Amino acid sequence: MKTELIAQLKKTIITVKDFPKPGILFYDITPILLDPKLFDQVISVMAEVAKKSNADMIASPESRGFLFGVPLANKLKLPFVLVRKQNKLPRATFSASYDLEYGKNNVIEIHQDAIKPNSKVMIVDDLLATAGTVDAISRLVKQAKSEVVSYSFLIRLKDLGGIDKLDQTKPIDYILEY
């Protein structure tokens, strides 16, 4: 099933050169959302990985991470932690800074009460590039006195080395690789 899913995803995802900046090749995943059957298959594959990791909650960054994290958490009946850009959450927060492939000095936050101590958190995002966002989320989880138990991505960009920056003792899953 995964081989067929990969083939369908590669036909569906649109690559856009020089977006959002010159030199960046952007993978537009929005056509996946126009195909409910395909989107459901993606979430089902991510759910199988999540079940094996014994995660008890899912955390994803805005905005495209939400597209996969929320339905995955719902499918597994797990709580979902919103990871937002700075000053977007109304209550006390934990904060972590990070850099992206195409931007520096970013800050993300979670509510301080979003993750209970000793929780087992799976980080879900649409794309793994440099791992800047994922590293920042991992630090937020640690601030909440909890543990990242696994990672799941729709796409991994292999030339950017992000996977090497993740905790290799934890399950790391992705569906597509470019």
From Swiss-Prot:
Transmembrane segments: none annotated. Keywords: Cytoplasm, Glycosyltransferase, Purine salvage, Transferase. Gene3D superfamilies: 3.40.50.2020. It catalyses: AMP + diphosphate = 5-phospho-alpha-D-ribose 1-diphosphate + adenine. Catalyzes a salvage reaction resulting in the formation of AMP, that is energically less costly than de novo synthesis. Pathway: Purine metabolism; AMP biosynthesis via salvage pathway; AMP from adenine: step 1/1. It comes from the Bacteria. Coiled coil: none annotated. Belongs to the purine/pyrimidine phosphoribosyltransferase family. GO terms for biological process: adenine salvage; AMP salvage; purine ribonucleoside salvage. Homodimer. One of its GO terms (molecular function) is AMP binding. Its EC number is 2.4.2.7. It comes from Mycoplasmoides gallisepticum (strain R(low / passage 15 / clone 2)) (Mycoplasma gallisepticum). InterPro entries: Ade_phspho_trans (IPR005764), PRibTrfase_dom (IPR000836), PRTase-like (IPR029057), UPRTase/APRTase (IPR050054). This is Adenine phosphoribosyltransferase. GO terms for cellular component: cytoplasm. PROSITE patterns: PUR_PYR_PR_TRANSFER. It is found in: Cytoplasm. Its main location: cytoplasm.
